[in-house]
Amino acid sequence: MKVNIIYSTLSGHTKKLADAIGEVLGVEPQNLKEDNGYYDCDLLFIGGGIYSGALSPELDGYIEFLNPQNTPKAAVFMSSVSEDYQKSNLAGKLREKGIEIVGEFSCNGSFLVMKMFHPNKKDIASVKEFAADVATKVLKNN
């Protein structure tokens, strides 16, 4: 099974989550600012932060080019200082493209003094468990 991890980050929080997922799956995460290639895969882990209730422009742009025939399944991971995860609608945008969502993960991110030290060790452990669970579920159903 071919797995890719794509993320966009302004603060570095999503990179921490992507690196943890990559560690579990043995996959090198790709930062959209450095590599926005559209690679075919069986399962895409895609993540970003929520900034004023919206996704980053890089992530929005990347989604536009995804094709469900080349990327049939995705798992979403996000961080946010507020509860704006649902406002971003990352999973909804992927579903609109015809991509099956096989998992969603969100945790706190920090901004200035709000929710300092997030993502923390507990968040990292949780995203690792999420990644392992999603990969196991997808492998079992293939």
What are these regions (language model features)?
Residues V3, T9, H13-E28, K33, ...:
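FMN-binding flavodoxin-like domain, especially the glycine-rich phosphate-binding loop
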